[in-house]
Amino acid sequence: MLGVDPKQVHAWYLAVYVDAVEWVELPNTLGMSQYADGGVMGSKPCIATGKYIQRMSPHCRGCRYDPAQRSGDNACPFATLYWDFLLRHEAALARNPRMALQVKNVARLADGQKRAVSERAAAIRRGEIGTDAGVSAEAATGFGRHA
């Protein structure tokens, strides 16, 4: 969702985990985690909105962001990045039956809403919004930009 280079994520896993074996790690990272193989390993991207994270974990307790909002000052960065991912990859995801509902929901957004999501996602990537505000996504993760 953040738009980092999947190959750099793969290289990072190999570098930091002593027990990482490339023949296992590569398909898991590029295929399942990053969906960089276009759906060979996984049938849909492993992405989630802030609402899903809130429902499934305690990580949102005390957070100032609202997982129900996709844009605006109070929008959860995960919600923003989720919708931005769908916007950026709408054409490719439209061919995936498991993503049909999400793609239809993207199509329902007004142009102004789409623009607001894209602008906020860009601000998140620049490090202007989020838990590491002031640190770009590249600096925070160590991974370069990708589509």
Regions found by a protein language model. Name each.
Residues 1-147:
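C-terminal catalytic domain of photolyase/cryptochrome flavoproteins
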